[in-house]
């Protein structure tokens, strides 16, 4: 019973960290990565919210630019429109689109670092809520006399250790992203 609660908490905490990592990949650092275009949607064949990566291949042209190559060449105008809507400035090169990523200003990098910290804090709150849920489940087992007082204490200690380890992981992910942001 306690192992199930602990495993469930670990799985949910790991998902919170994965969600944080995914969110942080979409924050522009000045380095061009295809993940920056994950949230770009285009109007493809009547569907207004088709993800860009389903209608084009996205690759790195160099460290500061991406190359978007549509699978269907007639989609270039719609892809350009989707990129403009997502606040990118595409340059059409015949059958492909190049997107230059200028490095952010010092002020913008500091804003982005604050955003990274905010996202990290959100992940920590999610992890603490998972801890709270697990502790409630343990308390319910204790109340129902399904476990002893010692098992309850041990279970709560294990959940706390799990929480501390996952919060440390969040701190590392946030610190790595901030370092990447603030280095020019």
Curated annotation (Swiss-Prot):
Pfam families: RRF. It comes from the Bacteria. It is found in: Cytoplasm. The keyword Cytoplasm applies. The keyword Nuclease does not apply. Transmembrane segments: none annotated. Its main location: cytoplasm. GO terms for molecular function: ribosomal large subunit binding. InterPro entries: Ribosome_recyc_fac, Ribosome_recyc_fac_dom, RRF_sf. GO terms for cellular component: cytosol. GO terms for biological process: cytoplasmic translational termination. Keywords: Cytoplasm, Protein biosynthesis. Responsible for the release of ribosomes from messenger RNA at the termination of protein biosynthesis. May increase the efficiency of translation by recycling ribosomes from one round of translation to another. Belongs to the RRF family. NCBIfam families: frr. This is Ribosome-recycling factor. The gene is frr.
């Amino acid at each position: 019973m306690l192992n199930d609660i602990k495993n469930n908490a670990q799985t949910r905490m790991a998902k919170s960290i994965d969600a944080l990592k995914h969110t942080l990949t979409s924050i522009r650092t000045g380095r061009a990565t295809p993940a920056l275009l994950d949230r770009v949607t285009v109007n493809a064949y009547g569907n207004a919210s088709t993800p860009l990566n389903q209608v084009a291949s996205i690759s790195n042209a160099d460290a500061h630019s991406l190359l978007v190559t549509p699978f269907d060449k007639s989609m270039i105008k719609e892809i350009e429109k989707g990129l403009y809507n997502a606040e990118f400035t595409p340059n059409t090169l015949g059958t492909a689109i190049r997107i230059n990523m200028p490095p952010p200003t010092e002020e913008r990098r500091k804003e982005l670092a604050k955003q990274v910290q905010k996202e990290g804090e959100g992940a920590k709150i999610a992890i603490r809520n998972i801890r709270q849920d697990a502790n409630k489940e343990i308390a319910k087992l204790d109340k129902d006399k399904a476990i002893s007082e010692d098992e309850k204490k041990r279970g709560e200690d294990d959940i706390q250790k799990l929480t501390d380890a996952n919060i440390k992981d969040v701190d590392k992910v946030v610190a790595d992203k901030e370092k990447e942001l603030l280095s020019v």
